[in-house]
Design a protein with these regions (language model features):
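Bacterial N-terminal signal peptides that target proteins for export
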Residues: 2-13
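General structural concept
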Residues: 89-149, 153-176, 264-292, 298-301
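Hydrophobic core
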Residues: 14-22
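Short glycine/serine- and small hydrophobic-enriched flexible loop segments
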Residues: 106-117, 285-293, 380-384, 472-483, ...
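Extended ligand-binding clefts on enzyme/binding-domain cores
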Residues: 62-71, 143-265, 274-278, 299-761
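A recurrent domain-boundary module in secreted/ectodomain proteins
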Residues: 754-799
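N-terminal module-boundary/linker segments of secreted carbohydrate-active enzymes
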Residues: 30-136, 294, 298-306, 359-368, ...
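Cellulosome-associated attachment modules in secreted, modular CAZymes
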Residues: 25-29, 786-866
Length: 866
């Protein structure tokens, strides 16, 4: 592999911060410096997939990705959100897991089976065996399906109305459950009739404490927990973690933990779960892929079909009210008039524990739908794949998914901005309280446009991951429709399915090709954050240009490898569906990408490449997409490959909230966490999680010393910033101008180096590598000569300054850059420059010399020759 170690460090040294609360790269001491041999080599994309999979899954327990919990001969260990513990995103602790992580495990296992069975000709190293990992991964994922669902099939489910909160401080005093407003799920009986032999819903709860760090469970056992409860302004930093099974063992003796969120003087012993349907859909997508690749498992397909069938619970309004612009309350339910047919943010369900002597159960849907939770590919799979279609046993499943496929596609057509990226979503319940819609707001089948559905701290549609996750599914669906056909009969917006997909993808891919950056030193940048302006046109049955809906790039990044890989995956499927051959990208260079990239957002990125912007419909768009995909994946591998996976040093100024974020606890409530931490008014994020600071505060699994040391380092940095005048008020969203300004002052916190190995990052990287191997088996990773050209006509002074590659009389980072360009891009060196570059004096300037010159510039070494 060309110049891997030095290129990684050089690229990292050149990168710079975008904004203080967005993670960005810096000098990496470990990233990109793999010392172990690759288990299956790295000369093909199949080999790279297998070598990375060997690190992340096969040896996942040893390398820290997987827990020992759950591991057996028929299942993998349960994946953590990340190898590292100090990471605050949607999980508030890195060794929690999510339904998202579980679904990625299923997806990568399906691809592993595919490569092991069908691509042995692409693998020359290692002992490749077919191990039927799909079934093992699905068995692992089933840990996220709750087994405690007492009486859920036997009871009459109710949905008692409670308005959503504008701010966490409003809970629970401002709104309470209203017994006079009670609804019910209109399709609950469908599932009781079809699946009464099951313990309850075959859906995943979204979050679990893998080794019982919080202590709500037993020992170090896997334990279901929850966090978010209190409306759109409740960030992860403002949550109170609590168990899904409430037995009043913790918190308050009479009110348990749930008493924080309601007004009950004595909380009943109960269970409660919430799903995140994009995870179930990703697992179904994986099974569909496996069936297409000939590595499916009939038992897994049957379970995926049942899961998909029951995922129709996510097609309904929160309280089963009519979808429309002037919804008024109706007790009972509005039947299918309450179905929006989109994938909403969640369905939640629960009931009394049998030990309580009570037998009530409840369920709610969700009125809010976000663009990035949609998965038309999963809907297509459930009605197009024979095994999945026949496996859905409940009434009207195929009918509902046919409608849902068309509705989801129309949702994307409606939300696509004039620029290309997809805007936020829609709701049937303004402010979560069925209030009157604002005047002039755009609507979609009676639902109002929402710029940032569900969450506002930070706004839920700023992050670029929403774009690449959502549109990957569209690109893959486009490929399957083009190659295998479509018998669903749907016509979104009056268009054939492939035409609708093409319209969305052409515009979206052109935007990313024009706004991504490939640098001549081997680095890259993609848009990382977007701001939104305007709204879509009112949906009238067909797509419009949405000239009043635009987005603006507010940040570029190069550390979010999961997003980068998902973008690459999208572009690969798009190019293949467009009929692009690998030979079409021969001779392309990095400056064909990024013609309209904005200047000044990233240091060293001066703006567009100067080329002509590629437009939707241009013949070269597919070629540029494939080229960009390959460059991104090859550069990620070169920059980020280390001994356990892929990573790049990050920074995150928003970690200042670790030590300053107040967490609302009602004045009427006092209690204790399992480890004795006090729950009362005045609590902070850290006061409820003192396990981050001391192992003696742990009741379940102990925090590692490495994590404790990192928190101490962050705290010392925070205290320096506070002494210099920095302050986090706790009153602003991190994505608001005021919030950004406050966090920008925490420069010392933002300077702390963070190294992350997120499981989903590895999952997206694996899928992009596997997709290359599947769709373009003839393509191999780009390589280059270890020796660059020189001009032999120059005279050489044998006493020249070693390290001075540009012959300007000093040794600086510019010399590293020039040698890097020489080795990677063929830029000519003078003969004197080549002599000076050979700092180990072995006769040839190589990547080892570039690395040593870099070490000299940052004073790791102090003299030459080396």
């Amino acid at each position: 592999m060309l110049f891997k170690k030095s290129k990684a460090i050089i690229a990292a040294a050149l990168s710079a911060a975008v904004v203080s609360n967005v993670m960005v790269a810096t000098v990496a001491s470990a990233a990109g410096t793999r010392t172990k041999p690759e288990a299956f080599g790295e000369d093909t994309y199949a080999e790279r997939f297998l070598s990375l999979y060997d690190d992340v899954v096969t040896n996942g327990v040893e390398n820290g990705y997987l827990s020992k919990n759950g591991s057996s001969s028929s299942a993998f260990g349960i994946p953590f959100h990340a190898v590292e513990e100090v990471i605050i995103e949607a999980p508030d602790y890195g060794h929690e897991t999510t339904s998202e992580a579980m679904s990625y495990l299923v997806w990568v296992a399906a691809m592993r089976d595919n490569i092991a069975k069908n691509m042995t000709d692409q693998v020359d190293e290692g002992d490749l065996q077919y191990t039927a990992d799909l079934a093992k991964a699905w068995a692992t994922m089933e840990n996220m399906i709750p087994t405690v669902q007492d009486n859920f099939w036997g009871g009459q489910v109710s949905a008692q109305y409670c308005g959503e909160y504008d701010n966490p401080e409003d809970c629970p005093d401002l709104h309470a459950a209203d017994a006079n407003k009670t609804a019910s799920n209109p399709i609950h009986s469908y599932f009781t009739q079809a699946y009464s032999g099951q313990k309850g819903l075959y859906l995943m709860h979204w979050l679990a404490d893998v080794e019982n760090w919080y202590g709500f469970g037993s020992g170090t056992d896997f334990t279901f927990i929850n966090t978010f409860q209190r409306g759109e302004q409740e960030s992860c930093w403002e949550t109170v973690p609590h168990p899904c099974i409430e037995e009043r063992k913790y918190g308050n003796p009479q009110r348990g933990m749930k008493g924080i969120f309601n007004r009950d003087t004595e909380v009943a012993m109960q269970y409660a779960y919430t799903n995140a349907p994009d995870a179930e859909d990703r697992a179904i997508q994986a099974v569909y892929d496996a069936n297409r690749w000939g590595v499916g498992d009939s038992n897994v397909s049957a379970k995926a079909a049942m899961m998909g069938d029951e995922l129709r619970n996510n097609m309904f309004d929160k309280y089963y009210q009519t979808i429309g612009e002037s919804t008024s309350w109706t007790n009972g339910n509005a039947g299918y008039d309450s179905a929006h047919y989109l994938m909403n943010w969640y369905t939640s369900w629960g009931g009394a524990l049998a030990s309580s002597g009570q037998n009530w159960v409840w369920q709610i849907g969700c009125s809010h739908a976000h663009e990035f939770y949609q998965n038309p590919l999963a809907a297509f799979a459930l009605i197009q794949d024979a095994d999945l279609k026949s496996g859905m046993k409940a009434q009207d499943a195929v009918k509902d998914y046919t409608t849902s496929l068309e509705r989801q596609m129309e949702f994307y057509l409606w939300l696509q901005s004039n620029d290309g990226p997809i805007a936020g979503g829609a709701t049937n319940s303004y402010k979560g309280r069925y209030e009157a819609y604002p005047s002039g707001v755009s609507t979609f089948y009676g639902m109002m446009y929402t710029e940032h559905p569900v969450y506002a701290d930070p706004g839920s549609n700023h992050w670029i991951g929403n774009q690449v996750w959502a549109v990957q599914r569209l690109a893959e669906l486009y490929y399957w429709v083009k190659t295998e056909g479509n018998t669903t009969g749907v016509k979104p917006g009056g268009m054939e399915l492939d035409a609708a997909l093409e319209q969305i993808l052409d515009k979206w891919c052109a935007w990313f090709v024009n706004n991504s950056v490939l640098t001549d030193d081997g680095d890259f940048y993609i848009p990382s954050n977007l701001n939104w302006s305007g709204q879509p046109d009112k949906w009238g049955g067909s797509a419009t240009d949405n000239t009043g809906l635009t987005c603006t790039i507010t940040g570029y990044g190069n550390t979010d490898f999961g997003c980068v890989a998902s973008l690459a995956n999208t572009l690969i499927y798009y190019a293949k569906a467009k009929g692009v051959e690998s030979s079409a990208i021969a001779g392309k260079t990095y400056d064909c990408i990024g013609s309209t990239a904005k200047a000044g957002i990233v240091d060293g990125v001066t703006g567009g490449s100067g080329g002509t912007a590629i437009k939707a419909g241009d013949a070269q768009l597919g070629e540029a997409s494939l080229y960009l995909a390959q460059q991104l994946m090859d550069r990620v591998w070169a920059i980020g490959r280390d001994d356990i996976g892929l990573t790049r040093t990050d920074h995150n100024g928003s970690l200042a909230r670790f030590f300053s974020q107040p967490v609302h606890v009602p004045s009427s409530y006092t209690g204790t966490m399992p480890n004795g931490d006090t729950i009362a008014s005045g609590a902070t994020f850290l006061s409820l999680r003192s396990m981050y600071e001391s192992q003696s505060n742990c009741k379940g699994v102990q925090t590692t010393q490495e994590a404790i040391d990192l928190v101490a380092e962050l705290k010392a940095a925070y205290e320096k910033d506070v002494a210099a005048g920095a302050s986090w008020s706790g009153n602003n969203s991190a994505s608001s101008d005021a919030g950004k300004a406050e966090l920008a002052d925490f420069t010392n916190v933002g300077a702390v180096e963070l190294q992350y190995h997120r499981f989903w990052h590895a999952g997206d990287a694996l899928m992009a590598l596997g997709t290359f191997a599947e769709l373009y088996p003839e393509m191999v990773p780009t390589t280059g000569s270890e020796v660059g050209p020189t001009d032999p006509t120059d005279d050489v002074d044998p006493n020249g300054l070693l390290g001075d590659v540009n012959v300007d009389g000093k040794v600086t980072i510019s010399d590293v850059l020039l040698l890097n360009k020489n080795l990677m891009a063929g830029e000519t060196l003078t003969a004197q420059g080549a002599f000076n570059a050979d700092v180990d004096q072995d006769g040839t300037p190589t990547s080892a010399d570039a690395l040593n010159i870099l070490k000299y510039t940052i004073m790791i070494i102090t003299s030459f020759p080396v």
